[in-house]
Amino acid sequence: MTPWSLPQFAFHLVTFLSIAFIASIFVLPFLTFSFVLSSATVGLSFASRTSFEIGLFFYDRFVILLQGQLRGMIDQLPSNQPAKEEKKVKAQQQGDELFTQQEQAAPSQTLGSTIPLQSIEESLLDST
């Protein structure tokens, strides 16, 4: 072992430790910042998914409610179709359950020969 071995080893050790310390001064804050951002990403992803599920829950409930209200509104509109008569018929095979059977009134027929020609000519003159 030469007399320069110990000082050379000490120099390399001190140089290595000082470079490692300086590198850790730069790297550790970035690692910490990266850890915080990745944790926030995971947390916000969970919150986003949860809020989406809550919104979807309310959306589904309100769609069902609004469909019922729209059907009620449609039922209140006057119909352009002939009136339908409903009669209840007991089902033969299913006991007490009642089924609704709809009958449509006979459609009215208007033949071309029954329309007076004067009314057609008047309607053409009125439109001009």
UniProtKB/Swiss-Prot annotation:
Pfam families reported in the protein's UniProt record: Osw5
Record topology, Extracellular segments: 29-34
GO cellular component: membrane
Compartments, record wording: Membrane
Membrane topology: Multi-pass membrane protein
Keyword Membrane: yes
Primary residence: membrane
UniProt keyword annotation of Transmembrane present: yes
GO process annotations (BP): sporulation resulting in formation of a cellular spore
Family: Belongs to the OSW5 family.
Name of this protein: Outer spore wall protein 5
Naturally occurring in which organism (per UniProt): Kluyveromyces lactis (strain ATCC 8585 / CBS 2359 / DSM 70799 / NBRC 1267 / NRRL Y-1140 / WM37) (Yeast)
